[in-house]
Amino acid sequence: MNTYEEMNNVLKNQKEFFIKNGAPSIDLRIDRLQRLKSLIMDNRYDFVDALNADFGNRSKNASMLSDVYGIMPAINLAIKNVKKWNKIEKKSSNFPFGILGAKSYIKYEPLGTVGMISPWNFPVNLAFVPLVSIFAAGNQAVSYTHLRA
């Protein structure tokens, strides 16, 4: 199976899963964010070692700071605010509907599966930071790190 077929298969499975199960709850979104944080922290030394092996001349401290610890503020912010970000927003209804008793609101809904292509110059950071927003919004992701970007 080639990369195109593999990605199509993953996309098909994720779409079917989302249609079957619907939008994830806020608690599940927070759980995904916490698991993402744990995954990054549990593997931070492996990430840094792999980056050093790939780039050869990058400081391990710089990689740890930019590629690993640079992700944590985004995750912490999302965990703290995901409930607020997903609240229904009441809006005023336009004339003449407002005077007729109409109610207007904005309800944010996930798209389902989101495609994400990340470049390779800061591979850990640029692959994981977008996942924070994707998971907080209740979406799933098909991620591809482009080797020539």
PLM ranges: what are they?
Residues 140-141:
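A short hydrophobic/small-residue beta-strand
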Residues 135-136:
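Short hydrophobic alpha-helices that are characteristic scaffold elements of the AMP-binding
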Residues 145-149:
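Conserved small/polar residues in nucleotide/adenosyl-binding loops
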Residues 111:
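Phosphate-coordination loops involved in phosphoryl transfer and adenosine-cofactor binding
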Residues 1-103:
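N-terminal Rossmann-like NAD(P)+-binding subdomain of aldehyde/semialdehyde dehydrogenases
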Residues 119-128:
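Conserved coil-to-alpha-helix start sites within the AMP-binding
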